[in-house]
């Protein structure tokens, strides 16, 4: 059988990323929600639990994919004129994370810009991201939360090991139903 080479696929060298099905109904996730929700409400008073999942990267991996999170993946919610906080994303590492183990990179103050999600998916902002991203050491069980408009990404995982994180997404309660109508993750997860 002949083998076809696609130059754009070379960017995927070393990629090994798994997203779980939604973990919303897990007892552990409910317990974590109960612990962190008071802090989330300090920043988004009408915060409502939207979704949670686990992302695992298998190293070594050079993959990055800078992006913004739900709801800003959808054009209606991705403009700075509506400068309200629409959502808060929570990352809880299930392994110790640092620069060698793929700690999430964030670009400070990037929530002040509009980021076209298709450009993000196509790698238009990769170079900008790598030049401006900051990474934080995050021991297992620590918490990083940020405005869902903030540009962020998994960073290269230089070691031959895995790294897993629990993600929890909170949204303003008045946009949840609209987002569920737009978001294809619900159809792929049986909701």
PLM ranges: what are they?
Residues 1-78:
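Non-heme Fe(II)-dependent double-stranded beta-helix
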Residues 3, 120, 143, 150-191:
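Non-heme Fe(II)/2-oxoglutarate
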Residues 39-48, 83-84, 94-100:
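Secondary-structure boundary elements
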Residues 67-75, 119-132, 181-186:
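Short, surface-exposed loop/helix-turn segments at secondary-structure junctions
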Residues 84-87, 97-155, 175:
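Double-stranded beta-helix
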């Amino acid at each position: 059988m002949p083998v076809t080479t696609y130059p754009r696929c070379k960017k995927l060298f070393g990629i090994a990323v798994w997203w779980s099905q939604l973990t919303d109904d897990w007892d552990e996730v409910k317990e974590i929600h109960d612990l962190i929700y008071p802090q989330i409400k300090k920043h988004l008073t009408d915060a409502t639990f939207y979704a949670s999942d686990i992302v695992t990267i298998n190293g070594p991996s050079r993959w990055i994919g800078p992006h913004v999170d739900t709801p800003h993946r959808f054009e209606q919610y991705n403009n700075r004129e509506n400068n309200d906080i629409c959502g808060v994303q929570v990352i809880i590492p299930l392994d110790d994370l640092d620069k060698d183990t793929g700690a999430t990179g964030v670009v400070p103050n990037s929530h002040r810009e509009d980021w076209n999600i298709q450009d993000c998916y196509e790698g238009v902002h990769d170079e900008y991201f790598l030049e401006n991203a900051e990474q934080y050491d995050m021991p297992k069980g620590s918490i990083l939360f940020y405005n869902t408009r903030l540009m962020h990404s998994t960073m290269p995982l230089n070691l031959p090991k895995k790294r897993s994180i629990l993600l929890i997404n909170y949204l303003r309660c008045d946009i949840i139903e609209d987002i569920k109508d737009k978001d294809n993750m619900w159809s792929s997860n049986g909701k």
